[in-house]
Amino acid sequence: SGGAVASAAVGGANLVMTACYINTLPYELIIQESVKSVEDLKGKSVGISRVGSASDVAARVLMKGLGLEPVRDVPILQVGGPTERAAAFRTGRIIGFPSPPGTIHLAKGMPHRVMISTADFKKRYEFPYICSTTTKTYLASHRETMRRLTMALVEATHFLKTRKEDTKKFIAKYTRQDNPQYLEDSYAANVKLHDRVPLVTREGTEVQIKEALARKPGATLRVEDIVDDSIVRELEKSGFIDKVYK
């Protein structure tokens, strides 16, 4: 994600995002059924994988969407991946956790409800989430390879948007899940979230840069240091993307 790229770049990594296929955070806040109001969340912990991760950003954004101040009103705990978060949720160590749409359908025997989703926001929360990332050196020396990769992923996005049943089979295969509701929700979310033209969100990248710089005083980083989506712009200008979608 853009947050990880920004953090790595602040630390000296020579990375650049060349395209972003999802430019927002596809997360919902899963909470215990006992939580009936926003007030019930205060003082109770929400679980994430690790600080700086997409789940961390999502937790903070969702808290603010509820009018709460992350950490101050609702502590954020690093508890690990999906399995660890589910275990912490079952035992009551955490009152909730951010989750991609549909994933909760895989958690059998866990009484829960969705309190808020980024899909509920009136304005899309800009965040470079699923992006093609490489080093500046590789992009300069293998630009044609990166161009062909981008073309293939634009075509794959079109396949996703137009071949529902086939796409659900791929989701089932690579997630190793066959829960019908999960597959349906996952597909519906992905169709909505994937951008037709995969430009990298400048607004979202700027926010992630500010977050990364706040963790490393004295460092400097600009959007243009970690974003080069010129290949996408070339493909759009050439008519390639329009041709794919005809």
Specify the residue positions occupied by each region the protein language model found.
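Pocket-flanking alpha-helical
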Residues: 1-16, 26-39, 55-62, 83-88, ...
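Pocket-lining segment of extracytoplasmic ligand-binding domains
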Residues: 3, 84-175
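A structural signal for short loop-to-beta-strand junctions that line the ligand-binding cleft
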Residues: 14-20, 44-47, 115-123
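Flexible hinge/capping segments at coil-to-helix
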Residues: 31-46, 140-143
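Short loop->beta-strand "edge-of-pocket" segments that line small-molecule binding or catalytic clefts
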Residues: 40-52, 151-158
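A local structural motif
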Residues: 64-79, 91-94, 111-113, 181, ...
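Secondary-structure end/capping motifs
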Residues: 140-219
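Conserved C-terminal helix/tail region of periplasmic/extracytoplasmic solute-binding proteins
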Residues: 210-246
